[in-house]
A protein has these predicted regions:
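ATP-dependent adenylation/nucleotidyltransferase module used to activate substrates
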Residues: 1-147, 157, 166, 173, ...
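AMP-forming adenylation/ATP pyrophosphatase catalytic core
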Residues: 115-122, 127-352
Length: 352
């Protein structure tokens, strides 16, 4: 059988390196593709990618995506914080950049398949691919891929879906490649920290009130964009028990604070609902993950007569955060996702 071409998104890190290595060993004609993005240390990163590609004897193509990344990912990120939301830029990047523009460039270069070093699996049935969790949950990245449409996944390969991170490191070391201690950061463009980044993009330190749920002002802050729901540090509110951020009003530059129990909510409204297949009839019941490090919890997705979509959990959840993505799972399979609009006001029944 004639070998097929596969384009591998290469970053110079251990995951994409081993993904390319495994595909080459399986008989694919591997071509590396590097996204040039407006990131700190990008020249050093490109040099590392070239070294790795040379070591693997795979050709490398550099795709300049600096402007689209700025327009679609960074601008959205900054605007979200300005509005008092907590965004997840990796979700936008995967949907629009990595599996959008980069994948399109690969296909235009006659690649038969698109591959990345993500820890996730694909289940193929009826000619379509659906996303599922990686075999090893500790590094599962299906949450970050949940906005991808079926047509974006049909020609995709995830070579590391069955691998543990430790096994990937060991495989790289058999080639004399050592990556331990080089774990990538959560948000690739925040090398100098969130506050410095947002300040450099025009978010100023405008003073505003710290208020309790009843509207009482108990302190001041220097910019609501410095906070996220559930945050404790930086409030400057000494007390016998800690205060936490429970809500952010970006328009009024106001941060609402409360005690630990005030972070517990049992439901929230969502928007931008995306189902990977045909939308199911509601209510839908399954597991819902509120953020990347949240343990999925039993919940149902319902719609009221006005069309507002709401998630109701079987038990209260901590720090439901507007702007974050929720991902819907049936067992290990991703079936949908949505963006959190705002937490429903707490009632006595919301608290444990």
């Amino acid at each position: 059988m004639t070998a097929l071409n596969v384009g591998v998104a290469m970053s110079g890190g251990v995951d994409s390196t081993v993904a390319a290595l495994l595909l080459s060993e399986q008989g694919w004609r591997v071509h590396g593709f590097f996204m040039r993005l407006p990131l700190p240390g990008r020249d050093a990163q490109l040099q590392r990618v070239r070294e790795v590609a040379g070591r693997l004897a795979v050709p490398l193509t550099v795709i300049d995506l600096e402007q689209p990344f700025t327009d679609r990912v960074i601008r959205s990120f900054v605007d979200s914080y300005r509005a008092g939301l907590t965004p997840n830029p990796c979700m936008h990047c995967n949907e629009q950049i990595k599996f959008g523009l980069l994948a399109e460039a690969m296909r235009a270069a006659d690649m038969d398949r698109v591959a990345t070093g993500h820890y996730a699996r694909l289940v193929r049935a009826g000619g379509r691919a659906s996303l599922a969790r990686a075999a090893h949950r500790a590094k599962d990245q299906s949450y970050f891929l949940a906005r991808l449409r079926p047509e974006q996944l049909d020609d995709v390969l995830f070579p590391l879906g069955e691998w543990s991170k430790e096994a990937v490191h060991r495989r790289a070391e058999t080639l004399g490649l050592h990556f331990r201690g080089e774990e990538s950061q959560d948000v690739c463009f925040l090398a100098n920290g969130l506050s410095a980044f947002l300040a450099s993009h025009g978010l100023d330190r405008t003073a505003g009130p710290l208020v309790t749920a009843d509207g009482s002002t108990i302190g001041q802050h220097t910019g609501c964009w410095q906070f996220t729901v559930g945050q404790r540090r930086g409030l400057g509110l000494p007390d016998a028990t800690p205060w936490y951020v429970t809500a952010i009003d970006g328009a009024a530059n106001r941060v609402v604070v409360g005690k630990a129990a005030d972070l517990m909510r049992q439901e929230c409204n969502v928007h931008a609902v995306h189902w990977t297949d045909a939308p199911p009839s509601l209510p839908w019941r399954g597991l819902v993950q509120l953020r990347s490090r949240h343990t999925p919890a039993a919940a149902e997705v319902i719609a009221d007569p006005a069309g507002t979509v709401r998630i109701v959990f079987a038990a209260p959840q901590r720090a439901i955060t507007p702007g974050q993505f929720t991902v819907f799972y049936e067992h290990d399979r991703v079936v949908g996702s949505a963006v959190i609009s705002r937490p429903t006001p707490a009632t006595a029944g919301d608290r444990p």
